[in-house]
Regions:
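Exported/periplasmic ABC-transporter solute-binding proteins
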Residues: 2-8, 13-37, 43-188
Length: 188
């Protein structure tokens, strides 16, 4: 869209779609949220699951971990950027920095747990679900979790607006919701 390409339907993060709405690139009233995902904390399969039930327990778990993997914030990945800010907010960024490991660009932090390079990994739950050899401990507690909402909308210049609207309607059905749940997304 930014480069002048056209599309019949847009599926983006809610923020990304809202930015296009402000630029009048989305047909008014055509947008709808359909799923969301949060971050997941993972350990190697069979390892004891640390306590992450409260902000303080989560903080202590991070401080006690020998090594932690998360997406490199410099690459712009939402979970890595959010987690780096969370470490600063919790006042432990300096303590965590020496034991931080980042996967290669487009890599998955959970793979570093499987390989033994990291004891814990934090990344979007649907992404870590795809890696065998890890167990999901759960989401970070409360506002220490980054919830991403996914939205769909019809481009203002769509040549197939009726088809796009039908697909958006389908994205909100129980059938679609079952697929989201199986992939670690939550229907909204």
């Amino acid at each position: 869209m930014q480069a002048g390409e056209s599309a019949a339907l847009l599926v983006l993060t809610k923020q990304g779609l809202n930015d296009l709405i402000k630029e009048n690139k989305v047909a008014p009233g055509s947008n709808a949220d359909f799923a969301s995902s949060g971050m997941g904390v993972v350990v190697k399969h069979g390892a004891p699951k640390p306590d992450i039930s409260t902000p303080e327990a989560y903080k202590q778990t991070l401080l006690k971990a020998k090594s932690i993997a998360y997406s490199n914030p410099a690459s712009g990945g939402a979970s890595g950027v959010f987690f780096a800010k969370t470490l600063e907010k919790m006042g432990i960024a300096a303590e965590i920095a020496p034991k931080t490991h980042h996967p290669p660009p487009s890599g998955n932090s959970a793979n570093l747990v499987v390989s033994g390079e990291a004891e814990l990994a934090i990344q979007q739950e649907p992404e870590v679900m795809e890696v065998s050899g890890v167990d999901i401990v759960g989401p970070p507690p409360g506002d220490l979790n980054n919830i991403t909402t996914y939205s769909a909308g019809v481009p203002a210049d769509s040549k197939e607006p009726n088809g796009a609207k039908a697909l958006i309607k389908f994205l909100q059905t129980p059938e679609a919701a079952a697929v989201y749940k199986a992939r670690g997304l939550k229907p909204v």
